[in-house]
């Protein structure tokens, strides 16, 4: 292939890639009273089959796309970089080290069972537990969650993770030091309750 032809071909591929990557998909704003189709179905061209649908085991965008479609975490990050409430309707912190999250009322699992703060505690403890062998076991430690690193390294029990349920709808997370990125880090797919 001639250098000029190769350059044009490469530029064409790059342009096509940029155009594909820049198209955003957004959920529709459906006005109240709108009659929806009887069958609600999401079809996603994901490129390949997922290796796992366990949020603590996934490692690729293929799985992350599906996890994001199926699960919600405490917060999400908008395309503009703003923290948005998801399972948590509000939160406050003391000295940027003790964070209290108040779960939205009425959040439920697919079987209708309420999602509680204890479900989140159990999920995060499972994430850091070396027995789970999660590729993201070190993530809570990176977030500066109390005992996260020691648990992932097998030095402490998962139950010592700095997260506790105050009641069914209130979660408290204790950090070892302030972390300016903490709220944004909560949007990671490995932190969704399971």
Residue ranges and their predicted role:
Residues 65-69, 82, 86, 98, ...:
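Extracytoplasmic/secreted proteins, especially bacterial periplasmic and envelope-associated proteins
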Residues 45-95:
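N-terminal lobe/hinge region of extracytoplasmic solute-binding protein
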Residues 89-139, 172:
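Aromatic- and charge-enriched surface segment that lines or borders ligand/interaction sites
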Residues 119-121, 128, 132-194:
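Surface-exposed binding/hinge segments that line
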Residues 41-45, 100-102, 162-164, 172-174:
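Soluble periplasmic/extracytoplasmic beta-strand elements of cell-envelope proteins
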Residues 2-26:
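Gram-negative bacterial Sec-dependent N-terminal signal peptides
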Residues 56-58, 103-111, 159-161:
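Second-shell loop/turn segments in exported
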Residues 30-43, 168:
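Immediate post-signal peptide segment of exported/extracytoplasmic ligand-binding proteins
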